[in-house]
Amino acid sequence: MKPDVLLYNSQHLINNITLYQLNHINIASFSFVFFSGLFTSFSPCLISILPICIMYISGEGQKLSQIDKLKNLFFFCLGAISSFTTLGLIATLLAKTYSQLFNGIPVISALVIIYMGFSLLNIVPLSTNNLNTRINNTNQNIKMYLSGVGIGLAISSCSTPIFVTLLIWVTSNHNLFIGLIFILIYSIGYIFPIIIGSLFSSRFLTTASSPFLNNLWAPFSGTILLSAGTFSLFSSILKY
């Protein structure tokens, strides 16, 4: 079985178990939502940008103290989690009026994944110069927070169908508070590899700096993203 097909089937299996846990809430449900986020993080989107995130948080080329690195990690993760919870809140509120909103999320996420794949393969440009200029002129904490928000918005496109299941559950049960707690726990699980990688950044940076990884990581990640995004796009279209 191809890796993208295996990943797709595994996500749907976890999605079904998550839905069962949401409909039979207990203490284990909260831990399972966390592990659902952790499992979903092993997707082409997050894996492809994981080295970039860790090097950015750790201040590659800068002599940052451990306290500064922890502060960077905190505000970066706060931004990423904020983007997830804000997306969840907006989608939930809009879904009360626009119930067809959720139907388009898998298609949009697939297109974002495909674009990220093309950008890693240098087929299409991913211009961030203007954004970087604006961010560099701000406070370091705000800079890390805004970077986390941007990364959170980008990688959230790879969190379907489990993230969509959470949103639909919140909407159908009209329990926004518990729903936001689930989304918060899920988002922490989703960015957990970034947290672990940043805490052990010294070892990671030594490995990531090898010429072999530098030359092969981008094309490998781009190919995986393009394959997974295309498969997800056609799967979503065929459902209509």
From Swiss-Prot:
Top-level taxon of the source organism: Eukaryota
Subcellular location(s) per record: Plastid, Chloroplast membrane
Keywords: Chloroplast, Cytochrome c-type biogenesis, Membrane, Plastid, Transmembrane, Transmembrane helix
Transmembrane segments: 32-52, 74-94, 104-124, 149-169, 176-196, 218-238
GO biological process assignments: cytochrome complex assembly
Cleavable signal peptide: none
Cellular component aspect of the GO annotation: chloroplast membrane
Primary location group: plastid
Pfam families with a match to the protein in the record: DsbD_TM (PF02683)
Membrane topology term: Multi-pass membrane protein
Function: Could be involved in cytochrome c synthesis.
Family: Belongs to the DsbD family.
UniProt protein name: Putative cytochrome c-type biogenesis protein DbsD-like
Higher taxonomy: Eukaryota, Rhodophyta, Bangiophyceae, Bangiales, Bangiaceae
